[in-house]
Amino acid sequence: MSKNYLLGIDIGTSACKVAVFDREGKVIASATGDYPVYYPQEGWAQQKPDEWWSAVCSAVRKCLVKGDIPPEEIAGVGIDGQSWSAIAIDKEGKVLTDTPIWMDTRAQEICDRLNQEIGSDNIFQVAGNSLQPSYTTAKILWYRENQPEVYKNIYKILQSNSFIAYRLTGTVTQDLSQGYGLHCFNMHTGKWDEKMCEKLGIPMDFLPDIVPCDQVVGTVTR
């Protein structure tokens, strides 16, 4: 059977969008799946990654049915999504806690402290971004200071797109475009910066392998 279709997944803030295209780029079918943002305290904004996954699975099924497309004819899947989450998973792939998302500001004090201790200019020279609570860096450190039981069980920290890719393939990676959410990502080399990891206090073991955005990272597990 020929593989004539491409499937795209976008993890938005309020919903996922899924579409199937033919090889000429024509949209054959599309669907969405909604999920909430939770605001448990002032300045907090978090989501449940497992709800993203459920919404994606539902939207994919809707697309395939709507377009009358056999799953075997999907040649490839591309995934993008909201940036700057901090999805903590354990070695079994279980999500350890709700993830703060890009609009969350709970880690402002951590950012202020590190900008003083390390130097905001020094951080910027490596990462190309100022250290702010919206980024992933501060969220990881917030886990360490406020959720030690979560922190000690972290295997990897993922972003929205790498989390969905992991659920689809079982492969833990992070595409290059999302690396900038961590200030230990060296914008000049495109790699994790060991010295900045040490300064920030982020274990390199938490960080997935960085891969190009167009690299095939695996195949669907079922």
Predicted regions located by residue number:
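Carbohydrate-associated surface elements
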Residues: D104
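Conserved H-loop
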Residues: P70, S120, P203
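N-terminal glycine/serine-rich phosphate-binding loop of ATP-dependent small-molecule kinases
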Residues: M1-T97, Q125, N153, P208-D209
